[in-house]
Amino acid sequence: MGSGDTRGESSLVAKPIEIILNKLPHAILAQQQFQKYITSPIYRYLSKLLLFREVAWPESTKDTQKGQVGIFSFQNNYADSATTFRILAHLDEQRYPLPNGAAEKNLPSLFEGFKATVSIIQQRLLLDNVDGATNSDKEKYVQLPDINTGFVNKTYSRIDLTHLLEDVETNVENLSINKTLEMDELTRLDSMINELESRKLKILERVKHIDSKSTNLENDVTLIKDRINFIEEYSLEADREQSLRKQMEEERSSEASSFTQNEEAISSLYDVESKDTRLKDFYKMPHEKSHDKNRQMHIISETYSRNSTAFRMTIPHGEHGNSITALDFDTPWGTLCSSSYQDRIVKVWDLNHGIQVGELPGHLATVNCMQIDKKNYNMLITGSKDATLKLWDLNLSRELYLDHSPLKEKTEEIVTPCIHNFELHKDEITALSFDSEALVSGSRDKKIFHWDLTTGKCIQQLDLIFTPTHSDIKMPARSLNNGTCLLGTEAPMIGALQCYNSALATGTKDGLVRLWDLRVGKPVRLLEGHTDGITSLKFDSEKLVTGSMDNSVRIWDLRTSSILDVIAYDLPVSSLDFDGKLITVGANEGGVNVFNMERDEHWMTPEPPHSLDGDELSRRIAIVKYKDGFLINGHNDGDINVWTL
C-alpha cells in the first residue's frame, strides 16, 4: 500500500475523530442521565478529550495533527498504548458500585440507557444548529415521531406499516427507559432530601448545644457583674498584699480583744435602729437578677417535650438526713433553698452543679416555710417554729460561705446574711407569702400578720375565728410530715396562705378556705368542701387549687365560688403547686402526681433509681414546688429531686 493510500486512510480516520472531539463530548457531557450510567473513568476520559482538543491541538496545527490524535490519546509515561486502552475500556465495578437493591429495581442496562440517550443527544445537536432555540426546547428529551393516522388508515403496504410499528415501539421502549431513569433520579433525590433532613437535625442539635454554651457564658457574665456590684456594695475591694497583711495582723491579736469586739458587735446587731437602717439599705442596693432566661427555657422545652417527665438530678441523702420541711427555688437553674426537720440552718444550693453554696444560720428551731423573691431582689424569707420570720440576703450568704471571704476579716462587727427579723407572733410560723412590698404570715397562735417589707413594720392583724367544733381538733399522725409546715399529731391551724396585691387566700385546719380583702382586713368569701385540714393552696386570676388531709385536691372557680373538679388520692395531700395549667401534687407517695388541666391528663413521676433502696415511708413526698417547667420535690428521707415537665 502506497503513501497516498496511507494519507487517504488517515483522512478517513481524522474526520470521525474531529466529529467526536468537536460535537459528541459536548452533547454527552451535557446530559446528567448519561453521566450517571457511563462509568466515571470513561466520563473523565471524554473530558480529557475536550481539554486535549483545546490545549494540545491549537488551531494553527489542527490540520497537521488530526491524523495522529489516535496515537496521542493513549500515550503516557506509565504504560504502553495497548495497556492504556485496556485500562480505559475496563469497567471497574468497585469505582461505581450499584446501590443496594439495584437488581430488584430492574433498572435498564448500560447499553439500553445509552440507546435511549442517543436520541436525546441527537435532538440537542440539532437544536444547537437551530436559531432561536431556547433552553426549555432543549429540555424536551424525546420528540415523538409525527405519525400520519390518515396514512395508516389508507395504506396497504405491510412493509411501511412494519417500519412505522418498529419506529413507534422503539420510541415507546425509549420512553419507558427514560421514565425508569427519571424515577430512579427521583428516588435518588428523595434519598438526598432524607440525607439533608438528617444533616439538618444534626446541625440543629449543634445549634442547641452552642446556644446552651452561649447561655452559660451569659450567666457567667451576669455572675461576674453581680460579684463586682457586691464588692462595691460592701466596700470589699483591696489589693492582695493588703489583704494578706491584715490577715496576719488579726492572727496575732489576742483572744480577749477579739471576744470584746465580737460582744460589742452582737449588741449592735440586735439594736432596733440599726436593723431598720440595714433593711432600708438592703432595698437601695442593686440586687440584679438575670432576666435573660427565655433562651435557656426554650432549649430545655425543645429537648424535653411537654408531658414527658425527665429526671435531672438528686441532692443526695445525708445532706439533710431528716424529712424536708420547706424548700423554694429561683428558675431556671438558679438558687435552691431548703430546710429539714430539726435542722435550724437553711441550706443554699446551686442547681447548675447540685452543690451547696451557702447557709443561713439564725433560727432557733425547725424552719416550716420559706419563699424566694421571684422578681427583683435575691432574697429569701423564712418562718420557723421559733415564732420568727427572717429576711435573708442570698448574695451575702454565698459570700460568707467562702473560706477566703474578706467579710470574715471584719472583726469590728459580725456580718450576717439575716437582714431583718419579724417578731410579733406568739407561736410557731406555719405559712407565709409575700408579693411586691407586702408580707403575710400565719401562725399557730391563730393570727395572721400583714407586714410592710420596706419598713419591717406590721400593717395590720387578722384574727381567725373558729367555731367551737373546730377550735380544738386533734388530728392523728398520717405521715412523718404533714406537708408544708408541721411534724406531729396536730393539724396546722393555718396550713397554707397566698397573697397577691390586696387579695389573700387562707386554708385552715377546719377545712375552710377564706378569701380576704386586705384593704378592709376582713374575709369576703368562704369556700366549703374539704372535710379535714388544708395543707396547701395556690390560685391565679380564675382558679384556686387546694390540697387537704382528707386525701383530696379540689379545684375552685373563683368567679362563681363553685367546685370545678375533685381529685381523690389514697393518702393525705402533703403539698401541691399550680401554674395555671399543671397541678403537681405530693400525696405521701413515692412520686409526684401531675395533672394537666387543659388536656385532662394524669401521670406520676417515676422514682429515681437510688430511692428504691429505702423503705416506703422514707421515700414519700413531703413537699413539691413547680415553676416554669421545673419540678423539685423533697422526700421524707431528706433527698431533693429535680425534674423537668
Swiss-Prot record:
Residues 74-126 are annotated as: Sufficient for interaction with FIS1. It comes from Saccharomyces cerevisiae (strain YJM789). Residues 1-274 are annotated as: Required for interaction with FIS1 and MDV1. It holds the Pfam family Caf4. Its main location: mitochondrion. The lineage of its organism: Eukaryota, Fungi, Dikarya, Ascomycota, Saccharomycotina. GO terms for cellular component: mitochondrial outer membrane. Keywords: Coiled coil, Membrane, Mitochondrion, Mitochondrion outer membrane, Repeat, WD repeat. InterPro entries: Caf4, G-protein_beta_WD-40_rep, WD40/YVTN_repeat-like_dom_sf, WD40_repeat_CS, WD40_repeat_dom_sf, WD40_rpt. It is a peripheral membrane protein. GO terms for biological process: mitochondrial fission. Residues 242-262 are annotated as: Disordered. Belongs to the WD repeat MDV1/CAF4 family. Interacts with DNM1, FIS1 and MDV1, components of the mitochondrial fission machinery. Interacts via its WD repeats with DNM1. Interacts with CCR4 and NOT1, components of the CCR4-NOT complex. It is however not a component of the 1.0 MDa CCR4-NOT core complex, but appears to be part of a less characterized, 1.9 MDa CCR4-NOT complex. Interacts with DBF2, another likely component of the 1.9 MDa complex. Interacts with SRB9 and SRB10, components of the SRB8-11 complex. The keyword Mitochondrion applies. It comes from the Eukaryota. The keyword Repressor does not apply. This is CCR4-associated factor 4. CDD domains: Mdv1_N (cd22881), WD40 (cd00200). Residues 242-254 have a biased composition (Basic and acidic residues).
